[in-house]
A protein has these predicted regions:
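A contiguous, well-structured pocket-lining segment that forms one wall/lid of small-molecule binding clefts
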Residues: 196-283, 292-304, 329-332, 349
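Glycine-rich phosphate-binding/hydrolytic loop that grips phosphoryl groups
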Residues: 310-347
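Short beta-strand scaffold segments in enzyme catalytic cores
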Residues: 25-31, 143-145, 151-155
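Glycine-rich phosphate-binding loop plus the immediately following alpha-helix
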Residues: 135, 158-202, 233-234, 238-241
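Conserved phosphate-binding catalytic cores of ATP/NTP-utilizing and phosphoryl-transfer enzymes
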Residues: 2-13, 120-142, 324
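N-terminal beta-alpha supersecondary unit
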Residues: 9-93, 122, 126
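Active-site neighborhood for divalent-cation/phosphate handling
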Residues: 96-98, 106, 111-137, 155-156
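Conserved phosphate-binding/catalytic loops in two-lobed NTP-binding clefts
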Residues: 119-120, 299-321
Length: 349
């Protein structure tokens, strides 16, 4: 595949990175030392009225704005394409149509400028966001990635060594937040709205599987390191139906607080077990769910240092893709032309 190098870039080398795995069109410029020169995120509000991301619409929106995102990233970095030394792009996992927009753009830029290209795994990007934070973390550590599309627990041995210990068997944690918010009438995306509502409620008011209420009980899926949130979502659905519209309206904040605590406890159970099994003494977080304050606090109760990137680096962004590219292989033309996208649940080719 014509690998040109597997080495950290020079500190002054600029990396232009693209991320289009879902519904955010992202472009960033990061230098070889890990300093972020720019980090542009263009979110697609068009999906709100559908209650979720529509893949075809996401792809079309990426096509519409990706060139503008690249121009903005270069402008904010006070850089030109002539100064870029490496192009990086998310290869997967994600929505294939959306990923292909980023891949095609990255390949075209690299080919036109005679630059190498780094194809990055999206989940490795979330891990690598921890290498960009003001208090940069270095391996080894345990890492929990929790977002709308992924929930994964892994051991990070070095910058390119990520061993999966557990993953979701159904819904992701972020998806559970969004679906719970929809059941409580908070709209989409609902994770942040549910967190705000939960701050006004009592997490011990209701019992949910695996949850944090004082009436809660350990769920059947609490054994092992894999995650499951489908049962929790169904439990909230039945509770909402049983209470009726008026009672749900009156106790909506309590429902939100108990549901959020159950998600946080489900994550903490697996992390605690993984800490014991691996002997890890540090935990890093990645993904949009890492921005949730209740989740962060619950994980801090486990007694090990918890490293969390800034909120803008927790959600999907291209700076984290550039960060991962600093430590991975770069491909020369024409080898990278054969790179294809891979969907969520597929193995990397």
């Amino acid at each position: 595949m014509n690998v040109t190098a597997v080495r950290p870039p020079r500190p002054d080398e600029l990396i232009l990175a693209l991320e289009t795995s879902c519904d955010d069109t992202c472009a960033a410029v990061v230098d070889g030392s890990g300093a972020i020169r720019s980090n542009v995120i263009s979110s697609q509000g068009v999906h709100d009225r559908f209650g979720g991301v529509v893949p075809e619409i996401a792809s079309r929106e990426h096509l519409r704005v990706i060139n503008t995102a690249v121009d903005d990233a270069l402008s904010r970095a006070a850089a030109t394409l002539d100064e870029i030394g490496l192009v990086a792009v998310t290869q997967g996992p994600g929505l294939v149509g959306a990923l292909l927009v980023g891949l095609a753009t990255a390949k075209a830029l690299a080919a036109a400028r005679g630059l190498p290209l780094a194809a990055v795994d999206h989940l490795q990007g979330h891990v690598a966001a921890n290498y960009l934070a003001p208090e940069r973390l270095e391996p080894p550590f345990l890492c929990l990635i929790a977002s709308g599309g992924h929930t994964l627990l892994g051991s990070v041995g070095d910058h390119e060594d990520f061993t999966v210990l557990g993953r979701t068997v159904d819904d992701a944690a972020g998806e559970a937040f969004d679906k719970g918010a929809r059941l409580l009438g908070l709209g989409y995306p609902g994770g942040a709205a549910l967190e705000r509502l939960a701050a006004e409620g009592d997490p011990g008011s209701f019992a949910f599987p695996g949850g944090g209420g004082r009436k809660g009980n350990a769920s059947a899926f609490s054994r092992g390191l894999d995650f499951s949130f489908a049962g929790l979502k169904t439990a909230l659905l039945y509770k909402v139906r049983d209470l009726g519209a008026d009672e749900v309206t009156r106790r909506r904040s309590d429902l939100a607080a108990a549901y959020q605590a159950a998600i946080a406890d489900a994550l903490a159970m697996r992390v605690q077990r993984a800490l014991l099994q691996t002997g890890a003494d540090r935990l890093a977080l990645g993904g949009g769910v890492a921005a949730n304050g209740a989740v962060r606090e619950r994980l801090r109760q486990l007694g090990v240092p918890v490293h969390v990137p800034p909120r803008e680096l927790c959600t999907d962004n291209a700076a984290m893709i550039a960060s991962a590219a600093r430590f991975g292989p770069r491909l020369a033309y024409p080898g990278y032309l054969d790179i294809d996208a891979y969907a969520t649940g597929e193995r990397r080719p």
